[in-house]
Amino acid sequence: RIDQDDRIALLGQNGEGKSTLAKLISDRLRPMAGRVVRSSKLRIGYFAQHQVDELHIDETPLDHIRRLRPSKTPAQLRAILGGFGIGAEQTETLVGRLSGGQKARLSLLLATLDAPHMLILDEPTNHLDIESREGLVEALTAYSGAVILISHDMHLLSLVADRLWLVKDGKVTPYEEDLETYRKDLLSTEK
């Protein structure tokens, strides 16, 4: 069960199914067996690092958001972009010329534009500089919906997550220890 104010970190080694679970929860992947139960009114925002590669490189950030909000004025669209750290200069820059961090901010903006009840973030700090990571932490802390995080960034997880779930051997179980214990467990299994 996931409640609206949950901040859940999915833990597990590479290949254990964290991203697959995130895709199942967000309805980006159909289950091979069983079912996923969710409210028909539930809106889920999903951000994965590969989405940065799905942006239209021959368009500007303003073009991307204008397509989704055609009734908004250019000033309103620029204000939305500015709220995600995409400044006036970048709004008219082709996405192909933006930095990795700027592309990641645009992708995150697009994932949250419809005010989802839940955000699922799969490796959200890849491509982000330190300032952008701090901004992400602030945004996630202020966000009123549920958050599910997959990240190797233990610092991010320690600042955002209040529940830990371990994905291992095809099962998801609450992880009752803290992140430092998990990190030590990981290091001991790698030896």
Question: What is the role of each PLM region?
Answer:
Residues R1-K191:
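ABC ATP-binding cassette signature C-motif
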